[in-house]
Amino acid sequence: MTSPARPAALSDSQLDRVEGVLLGQAVGDAMGAPYEPGDIPFTGTPELLGGGFGDYAPGEWSDDTQMSLYIARVAATGADLTSREALDEIARGFCRWVALDGASDVGVQTRRVLGAVVDSRDEPGIAARMRAAAADLDAATRRTGGNGALMRNGIVGLTRLDDRWATAASARAVAELTHADPLAGDCCVIHAEMIRSAVMGPPWRGGHLPAAAAAMRALDLIPAERRNYWRDLFDGGILSDSRCLEPPSGDGFTVHALGHAT
């Protein structure tokens, strides 16, 4: 697999932020998993309760972090995540996760895509077949904007810290393995750039984290024909702070999930 040049050495502060992305995803996932079905009342303080769709133990992370680990293992080699070899390895990992590694729970959309190709996982070109299965599902349903690609995306924002365009390309390429809706890819591009810029930017001094401003700055990475769609959403308050005060409802749509997560 192709290995692009490594970024310049990171400061201690930047390394702390990198670790925060990885640990924050795992801890936040474990904390949020029991609330996902919507049948547990929120008391104001999230707790590591366990349960959820995967009947998780308290403190156990869910399928989203499980999937992100397969991306992380490939990214850790220094591979270009847009390359055929890297995408094949990620796609093969997703299939192994479902077939062999004990996936605790799989989203409906992701399950359908992986189910279409899992039996051919060891044959060449698995990533291309997975993308084709995702495209077929989109053509059949026109409802492939689920949040699954976004939920596993955090690691991608750390893979090309010196190159925002390469980060964006990687985010879209990995998202498109299972999610053909362009909005799913857009969400992953915006999210990855928000992570990349937060890691590479100046140290946080406390106070408000300008999520909406960071998201707006990522819009040049989105195809021109959809920038106004995103600009209107951001201007309309999709990233409003008030959304963080209680677990959101109806965030299965990737656009809503991006707003709730930030």
Language-model features, listed with the residues they occupy:
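Structured, active/binding-site neighborhoods that engage oxygen-rich ligands
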Residues: 1-262
